């Protein structure tokens, strides 16, 4: 879905979409392909901990928030000098976007669930050499009547 979204954004501007694995969603490992109900049933203790202390959880055969944060931050560090003074559009997934927002606000990963996101919500972060400013977060105005006040909390 992220690639389709990126292509829809790029097409009218004649831009080419480039993919970066560093912006992939957190690897849920053994949870991949399961519904929330199935995860709760098969991994009740781990799921509870994911809700309460996500920063302390590594999913079986999956990733931790620290690992996701490291790869996303690495991609930002790689992109910044290549696009200094330019506007770029990164299209990613729930956990990486939440971590980018937390980083811009100077908040730790344990605040993951403090950030509410809607599907296709737009977030704008301006980066300097030593700073980040959150300009817009989870804007869904482009969806018009499709969205009401119900930003989802999918975790």
Predicted regions and their residues:
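Active-site-adjacent alpha-helix immediately C-terminal to a catalytic or transition-state-stabilizing loop
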Residues: 3-4, 74-131
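Short, well-ordered beta-to-alpha junction loops that form the rim of enzyme active sites
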Residues: 22, 62, 88-95, 137
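Amphipathic, non-transmembrane alpha-helical scaffold segments
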Residues: 40, 65, 69-73
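Acidic, His/Gly-rich catalytic cores of divalent-metal-dependent hydrolytic chemistry
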Residues: 135-155
